[in-house]
Amino acid sequence: MSKQTEETEMSSLTEEIQILKKEKQAMILAHYYVPDEVQEIADVTGDSFYLSKVAKEADAKILVFAGVSFMGESAKILNPEKKVLLPDPAADCAMAHMADVEKIRAMRDRYPDLAVVCYINSTAKLKQYADVCVTSANAVKVVKALPNKHIYFIPDQHLGSFVAAQVPEKEVIVGDGYCPVHHQITAEEVRQAK
């Protein structure tokens, strides 16, 4: 297929999507991680927390969430009256599943004053067992404000460890979840990228 043919097809597809968005009162929200051509047609592009906030304030009846499954779940939780579509239901975040409900129960039995703090990048099932959900931007502030001495931070071990270092007056027990992609990045690769 020639570049010109590809551009013509993309232009036609874009036009069709714009018409459908208007007809259906739909809004496309795209995460930064999706391909450029999806971001270009989106009404809004951002991180998962920002997109959830925009979804909550949107007048659209249908939210098309170009991202991973937990993002679509979060949008639906915040917008139960709206239809939320996830173009690729198989799009998933491995870390979102790296905490166990049974372990949460065991931790609550062990520490009666425990607060379970769940990173927003988690499944709806996991969030329902948390006392509070946080973003990377507000995690330290939220944990500091909690009256509990014992905190179980799930699922992200790296964000949890950062929070623990910033809030030494609390006993922060960190889950063992991680982003497999980020976990592969080495210090040497970071130095080379500078």
Stretch-by-stretch model annotation:
Residues S2-K194:
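Active-site loop-to-helix "anion-binding N-cap" substructures in soluble metabolic enzymes
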